[in-house]
Amino acid sequence: MTRREFAMLMATALPAWGLTAPKRARAAEPIPVTLYKNPQCSCCESYAQYLDQNGFKVDVKATNDLAEISRKAGIPEHLEGCHTSFIGGYVVDGHVPVKTIRKMLDEKPAIVGITLPGMPPGSPGMGGEKTGSLIVYAVSRDGAVASIFDVD
C-alpha cells in the first residue's frame, strides 16, 4: 500500500469510525431504574438483579406503601404486580421481562406503563417453572383501558 493509498484510507475510515463512537458509548450506559418493593420481598431483589444483569442500573427502595405507589402511578388495583418500577418516564409493575421493557422504551407508546399482574411462576426474578404465557398489559393514561402489550 502506498502512502497516498494509506492516507486516503485514513481520511475516510477515521471520520466514519468517529460517527459510531457516540452510539457505542450510549449502548454501554445502564438505564436507570427506581424499584419500589415491600421490605420483606426477596423475589423483588431477584428481579432487581435480573435488571442489573441486563443493562439497567437499579435503585431499590423498600416501602410499606407499595399499593399507594402503584395507584398513584396509574396502575389499576386488579393489575398490580409484586413491585413498582419507574424506567424512562414509564411505570413498570411486576416481573416484566426485559425484552418487553425494551420494546416499550423503543416504541415510546402514549401509555402510563406496563404491568405483569401478580407473581407468575417462572417470570424473571420468580422461582419455579413457567406454567403459561406471561401476559403484559399496557395501561392507558386515564387508567380506564388496559390492553395486551406483549405476550412472552
Predicted regions and their residues:
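N-terminal secretory signal peptides and thylakoid transit peptides that target proteins
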Residues: 1-14
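C-terminal segment of N-terminal export signals and the immediately downstream linker at the start
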Residues: 21-38
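Short active-site oxyanion
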Residues: 32-33, 56-58, 88-91
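Conserved redox-active cysteine motifs that mediate thiol-disulfide chemistry
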Residues: 38-49
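Extracytoplasmic/secreted envelope proteins and their assembly/folding machinery
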Residues: 48, 63-66, 98, 102
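Iron-sulfur (Fe-S) cluster-binding segments and ferredoxin-like electron-carrier domains
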Residues: 49-56, 60
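Thiol-based oxidoreductase modules, predominantly thioredoxin-like and allied folds used
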Residues: 58-69, 78-79, 87
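Thiol/selenol-based redox catalytic cores and closely related redox-interacting motifs
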Residues: 72-152
